[in-house]
Amino acid sequence: MDSNTVSSFQDILMRMSKMQLGSSSEDLNGMITQFESLKLYRDSLGEAVMRMGDLHSLQSRNGKWREQLSQKFEEIRWLIEEVRHRLKITESSFEQITFMQALQLLLEVEQEIRTFSFQLI
């Protein structure tokens, strides 16, 4: 994984954790948790691709990896919609910048996961 992507994830997670969104802080914590989960999943797919012979290991370890991949794409789509919604309703420039960067990162990660998954198929 690209070191810029790692720092982008860490930066966005740190910024999101500092936001005070009042009653929606539970929702934000859920988004942060999903971001972290997505990062770990993307990293594990990337490592599997780097080892290329690891496809059989990946399949035997998790016979439902295609189903899991589909679920991750659903999570990404949900996060994209949630981030877009937050972007529309927030008035704080700090939050707008953070959510714009989060949206860009989600789109990049979605593309990376697609690329990794095509290499594994």
Curated annotation (Swiss-Prot):
> Where's it found, cell-wise?
Virion; Host nucleus
GO CC term (a single one)? host cell nucleus
Which GO BP terms, alphabetically?
exit of virus from host cell nucleus through nuclear pore
User: Which UniProt keywords are listed?
Assistant: Host nucleus, Host-virus interaction, Transport, Virion
Q: Does the keyword Protease apply?
A: no
HAMAP family, from UniProt? INFV_NEP
Its quaternary organisation is: Interacts with protein M1. May interact with host nucleoporin RAB/HRB and exportin XPO1/CRM1.
The entry assigns this protein to a family as follows: Belongs to the influenza viruses NEP family.
Reported function? Mediates the nuclear export of encapsidated genomic RNAs (ribonucleoproteins, RNPs). Acts as an adapter between viral RNPs complexes and the nuclear export machinery of the cell. Possesses no intrinsic RNA-binding activity, but includes a C-terminal M1-binding domain. This domain is believed to allow recognition of RNPs bound to the protein M1.
Q: What else is known?
A: Average number present in a viral particle is estimated to be 130-200 molecules.
Name the chain's protein: Nuclear export protein
Biological source species: Influenza A virus (strain A/Whale/Maine/328/1984 H13N2)
**The gene coding this protein:** NS
